Amino acid sequence: APGGYGSPQGSSGTDVPAPLPVLQNADGRVPWCADGYYLAVRPQFTFDSDFHAGAYYVQEASSQFVGHIVAACGGIRGGRVLDLCAAPGGKTTLYSTLAGRGGLVVANEIVRNRAAVLADNVRKWGVGNVAVTVNDPSQVARLEGWFDAVAVDAPCSGEGMFRKLEEARTEWSEAGVALCAERQRGILREAWRTLRP
């Protein structure tokens, strides 16, 4: 089941309940995300004004695990965070909330139309501490040693989509995996340069 998590206000410590569309459909809490809920079924979120107003963001529960990792590493409140392969923005909204208004999240997406979706999701989330950029990782790497934390959800060969999409299974190839692995190595090489020593 998809996970849905509540508002940025709820994540940042104020006692704001999850939006009604999430609570009405909740099928238990996501143990590693304080504001995460499993959803029994996936409702038509696109018709929900709370969703469009940024009251919640829907993503897989596994994607919400990054909040647990960030906490285990000491948190990012007030820090500078690079989210290098950021679209569509689910993890970016989480980093934004965890960094707080005193922090900065640079959310980069190299594909322009995906960056537009990212920018829209960040705008709806409304924390106001995210700068969306459209750069090749080599350009971002010029900010050498500038970020306190760097997140990379690199493009992959799509095996995780096998259970959802028939086309993911039919388009898969060993050559595609090799190409993705090389691309990932390049992205990680550039991302590493931006991390504060």
What do the predicted segments below correspond to?
Residues 1-197:
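S-adenosylmethionine
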